[in-house]
Regions:
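Transmembrane catalytic cores of multi-pass membrane glycosyltransferases
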Residues: 1-5, 101-104, 118, 123-274, ...
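Transmembrane-helix motifs of polytopic, lipid-linked glycan transferases
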Residues: 9-34, 73
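Transmembrane alpha-helices and membrane-interface helical segments
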Residues: 21, 73-80, 109-117, 195-202, ...
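Membrane-helix interface segments
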Residues: 30-35, 81-87, 124-125, 208-209
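Membrane-interface micro-motifs in multi-pass membrane enzymes
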Residues: 35-78, 252-272, 297-326
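Membrane-interface alpha helices of multi-pass inner-membrane proteins
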Residues: 72, 85-109
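Short hydrophobic alpha-helices at membrane interfaces in multi-pass membrane enzymes
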Residues: 77-94, 126-130
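Signature aromatic-anchored transmembrane alpha helix within multi-pass, membrane-resident enzymes
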Residues: 214-216, 267-268, 275-291, 295, ...
Length: 343
């Protein structure tokens, strides 16, 4: 129909703008020109065509893809100098912050870069300050808006009866379990393999054998479990199966202690491997923070009764942060190894 045609054209233009602005943020230096052609391929790899169709193309793209695009365009504008660019960022950041997950993503990301500039340059980056304020307003708005409470009430009855009776700690614990189940046990996201393989290859090239061992161990654990072999995640799956047999409002920390611990160890190992990989520790810290921001944005779904109904689309911020870190690792390769290889 004509409506779908207009929507498809709009989505195509939005994605083109996304790639242009993404490359403008992370690959602005001409020595990274080759990576600019890789970005679209990586995007299609980690966001396959069916990813944004789980709740219908228009609904899913409107709720997740367009806020992602708006956030990147707004971020690109903040990276530019001049009042005109700052003003231009407003509508895009406001649109992005109307989606709760990207509000959190923007708030933590811009706050970090604001602090980073302060510690490194001893001056305030007013663009990031404005971005932080806008994201903070968006976060507060999402928390106090009357419509949020009503929607939460309706969704509780529909998707998770008894959700309102769970404590905050239990909600977060359930979100933690579900997030890591998808990452490590069922391994449904391509980004986890791409990230681990990227870390492993670069660490071997740089002869950082500890990082190689750490990333290789996690990759082996995830792959072996995916292929049906016995691993430390086998027992995790059994605990999950047991938990699924319990009433949906019941959660025992004692019964789930093993998977909680294993997930924490896997996350810690990945964090250490990334930190070791970068020679510039500010870059290492930035990569870890960006990955943590995506994880936190996904974890925010813990506070929603649709936690088990919303599907993989709620992992969009986490996948996006993984893409950023992968690109940062590729940049590290060019900075430290690529020049020597091609001389």
């Amino acid at each position: 129909s004509a409506h779908y045609l207009v929507f498809d054209i709009t989505m195509f233009i939005a994605v083109v703008c996304f790639f242009y602005c993404f490359n403008g943020i992370f690959l602005k230096n001409d020595k990274y020109w080759g990576l600019r052609f890789i970005t679209p391929a990586l995007f299609l790899l980690i966001f396959p065509s069916i990813f944004f169709t789980s709740a219908g193309l228009i609904a899913t793209a409107t709720n997740y893809l367009f806020p992602l695009v708006a956030f990147v365009i707004g971020w690109y504008c903040l990276e530019k100098k001049g009042l005109a660019w700052l003003v231009l960022s407003f509508p895009f950041l406001i649109l992005a912050c109307m989606q709760e997950q990207f509000t959190i993503f923007a708030l933590i990301t811009f706050s970090f870069y604001l602090l980073k500039d302060w510690f490194k340059k001893k001056k305030v980056n007013y663009n990031y300050l404005v971005g932080t304020v806008l994201a903070f307003i968006g976060t507060v708005s999402a928390m106090v808006a009357p419509g949020s409470a009503h929607r939460n009430l309706v969704e509780t009855k529909t998707w998770y009866p008894g959700f309102d009776k769970l404590s905050l700690v239990v909600k977060v614990a359930k979100g933690y379990m579900e997030t890591n189940r998808v990452l490590f046990v069922t391994s449904e996201l391509t980004i986890i393999y791409l990230l681990l393989i990227t870390i492993l290859v670069l660490s071997l090239l740089k002869r950082h054998y500890l990082a190689s061992f750490l990333s290789g161990s996690v990759l082996y654990t995830v792959l072996s479990n995916r292929l049906g072999s016995t691993s430390i995640l086998t027992a995790v799956q059994r605990v999950i199966d047991f938990q699924n047999q319990q009433p949906i409002t019941k959660f025992s920390f004692k019964a789930n202690l093993y998977p909680i611990t294993i997930y924490a160890v896997l996350l810690l190992v990945i964090t250490i491997a990334i930190f070791i990989l970068f020679e510039d520790k500010w870059q290492a810290t930035s990569a870890i923070v960006i990955l943590a921001v995506g994880y936190a944005a996904r974890m925010s779904v813990s506070l929603s009764p649709t936690i088990y109904a919303s599907g993989l689309r709620t992992f969009t911020p986490l996948i996006f942060s993984g893409l950023i870190v992968v690109i940062m690792i590729y940049r590290e390769f060019i900075d430290k190894i690529g020049n020597r290889l091609f001389q």
